[in-house]
């Protein structure tokens, strides 16, 4: 059985509440844009691709059964909702780019006098629904492209390391970095996968471990602080992580802890790959210094499962992401191939 983080059909949207995993698997309804914003902000759904899809599908739910007198009224409502949704989590670029695409489509339909109000609404709904389908096909391509690079010239199974959660729970299905690992396993060339717990929100322990156990992959959970010791004591063939935003020069914002893994990988001579769809690449940002880093509430650091683990009164710094410099990245695995960071901007412009 395939894991589904997102269930959608005919204007009805449900998401798997990832705050409850792995103890409980519960789907919750998303009845409109406010629910979508809340689910994204509270991290009931997370992962840059999934955030974009849920955000846009919540817009579909919002407008699905409504009637509009004019195309302008529909366009204004869509614009307001999209502007609101992109404030839910600022670092992941996928939702912003998806919102920009929808806005561009709306402007085009608004200018086309042959398109009716209902026709305009249906075209927008159709385009957003296609995002769900396309994300899965893109992830499959990312998995294949990554596996091709990792197994090239290798005559033995691989040991791989990943961080945070980049699988079916972070996307429409299959996953990005975890999709690469799945693809390696499908070729019977995966010896073992290690996943970090990913403090402070424990997406690795709660979600990635959940997916690995579900898929019956040979896997071991380690703490974030064990990565250097792991690379030093056991032969790790490659590290594969996801991305929430990739700048034009290849600098990559991903879950906090990614940067230190890349530094340690460089020291030990372990290839460090980023797996991300083109929707995570933001060529409008020159380099990582311009990426806005979201800071999360203190209680996410001081509490686990509602129980305080830190001394009351201690100050906290809780950035959700860090930026890995492009020079530490071996390659960026996309649905259109594996690229060197310096090749990104040109490849995106060729779309």
UniProtKB/Swiss-Prot annotation:
SUPFAM superfamilies: NagB/RpiA/CoA transferase-like
Pfam families tied to this protein: IF-2B (PF01008)
Entry annotated with the keyword Amino-acid biosynthesis: yes
Enzyme nomenclature, EC number: 5.3.1.23
Active site: 244
Substrates-to-products reaction catalysed: 5-(methylsulfanyl)-alpha-D-ribose 1-phosphate = 5-(methylsulfanyl)-D-ribulose 1-phosphate
GO CC annotation: cytoplasm; nucleus
InterPro entries for the chain: IF-2B-related (IPR000649), IF-M1Pi (IPR005251), IF_2B-like_C (IPR042529), Initiation_fac_2B_a/b/d (IPR011559), M1Pi_N (IPR027363), NagB/RpiA_transferase-like (IPR037171)
GO process terms (BP): L-methionine salvage from methylthioadenosine
Residue numbers marked as site, Transition state stabilizer: 164
Major subcellular location class: cytoplasm
Keyword Membrane carried by entry: no
Record keywords: Amino-acid biosynthesis, Cytoplasm, Isomerase, Methionine biosynthesis, Nucleus
Pathway it works in: Amino-acid biosynthesis; L-methionine biosynthesis via salvage pathway; L-methionine from S-methyl-5-thio-alpha-D-ribose 1-phosphate: step 1/6
Subcellular location: Cytoplasm; Nucleus
Residue ranges the record marks as coiled coil: none
Entry's Gene Ontology molecular function annotations: S-methyl-5-thioribose-1-phosphate isomerase activity
Alphabetical list of PANTHER family matching this protein: METHYLTHIORIBOSE-1-PHOSPHATE ISOMERASE
General function of this protein: Catalyzes the interconversion of methylthioribose-1-phosphate (MTR-1-P) into methylthioribulose-1-phosphate (MTRu-1-P).
Family that this chain belongs to: Belongs to the eIF-2B alpha/beta/delta subunits family. MtnA subfamily.
Protein name: Methylthioribose-1-phosphate isomerase
Taxonomic source organism: Anopheles gambiae
């Amino acid at each position: 059985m395939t894991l589904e983080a997102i269930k959608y059909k005919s204007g009805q949207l449900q998401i798997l509440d990832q705050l409850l995993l792995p103890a409980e698997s519960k789907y919750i309804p998303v009845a409109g844009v406010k629910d979508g914003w809340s689910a994204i902000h509270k991290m009931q759904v997370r992962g840059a691709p999934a955030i974009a899809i849920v955000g846009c599908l919540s817009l579909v739910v919002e407008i699905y059964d409504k009637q509009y007198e004019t195309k302008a009224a529909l366009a204004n409502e869509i614009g307001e909702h999209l502007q609101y949704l992109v404030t839910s989590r600022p670092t992941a670029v996928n939702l912003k780019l998806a919102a920009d695409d929808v806005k561009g489509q709306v402007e085009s339909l608004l200018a086309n006098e042959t398109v009716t109000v209902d026709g305009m609404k249906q075209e927008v709904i159709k385009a957003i629904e296609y995002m769900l389908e396309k994300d899965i096909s893109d992830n499959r391509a990312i998995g294949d492209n990554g596996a091709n690079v990792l197994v090239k010239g290798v005559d033995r199974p691989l040991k791989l390391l990943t961080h945070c959660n980049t699988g079916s729970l972070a996307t429409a299905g299959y996953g990005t970095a975890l999709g690469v690992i799945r693809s390696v396993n499908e070729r019977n060339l995966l010896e073992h996968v290690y996943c970090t717990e990913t403090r402070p929100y424990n997406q690795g322990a709660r979600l990635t471990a959940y997916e690995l156990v579900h898929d019956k992959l040979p896997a071991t959970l380690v703490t974030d602080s064990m990565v250097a010791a792991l690379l030093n004591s056991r032969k790790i063939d490659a590290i594969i992580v996801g991305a929430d935003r990739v700048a034009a020069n290849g600098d990559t914002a991903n879950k906090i802890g990614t940067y230190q893994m890349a530094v340690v990988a460089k020291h030990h001579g372990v290839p460090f790959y980023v797996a991300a769809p083109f929707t995570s690449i933001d060529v409008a940002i020159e380099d990582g210094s311009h990426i806005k880093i979201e800071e999360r509430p203190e209680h996410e650091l001081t509490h686990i499962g509602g129980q305080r683990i830190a001394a009351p009164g201690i100050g906290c710094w809780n950035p959700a992401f860090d930026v890995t410099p492009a020079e530490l990245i071996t390659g960026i695995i996309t649905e259109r191939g594996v690229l060197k960071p310096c090749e990104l901007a040109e490849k995106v412009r060729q779309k």
